[in-house]
Amino acid sequence: MNPRVIRLWLPSAVLLSLVPGHFPVRGPSTVTGTVGESLSVSCQYEKKLKTKKKIWCKWKSNVLCKDIVKTSASEEARNGRVSIRDHPDNLTFTVTLENLTLEDAGTYMCMVDIGFFYDAYLQIDKSFKVEVFVVPGKPPFKGSRPGNGINILASPTSSAVHTQPNVTTDDTIPAPSPELRSLLSSPHFWILVSLKLPLFLSMLGALLWVNRPQRCSGGSSAWPCYENQ
């Protein structure tokens, strides 16, 4: 086809595409998916395009749409993470993008390949533009309350344990310390006690003898006699 014919055809195709109800291919104008998940887009076409191959392509420029995946009869066709399946019975075809990434966002086309060169690249009236948006996924919940940064760790079998303070009463006799028990069990300790105990008793007896009350020698009074102070 001569370039002049293409230039004349393109405005006509654009005008035809603006006529309400003239879209042989229709679909959602915008779709939104989440990173890591799958996104399906369903496009409809007219009955006269039932036997034609259906294409899902990414819009690269004003006149170029790079094919990503194309149907093969009614069987599913796949290219990497993108698959397409034609449903001739209800005149629709479905495109599925798996494991979405942020780079998958952009402008795509639901398109029907009618076999002519100028229509394969400039199919204004045999395609439908779909804007794909991809949003980041939500972070997994790890048991922390949003906003406070405090992790809450709990065991399903844990239970509250109440401890009572130690209470000491007058009737409670504290146990001897390990040092005291070791001293009492030492034979050297008892030998030392047996040697010093008589000396201690003798000194105590002498002290009591010196401090005993004295009787008055001149009388028979039973009262003790004290020196005048």
Swiss-Prot record:
GN (gene name): Cd300c
Name assigned to this protein: CMRF35-like molecule 6
Gene3D superfamilies (alphabetical): Immunoglobulins
Predominant location: membrane
Entry keyword annotation includes Transport: no
SS bonds (residue pairs): 43-110
Organism listed in the record: Mus musculus
Residue ranges crossing the lipid bilayer per the database entry: 189-209
GO CC term (a single one): plasma membrane
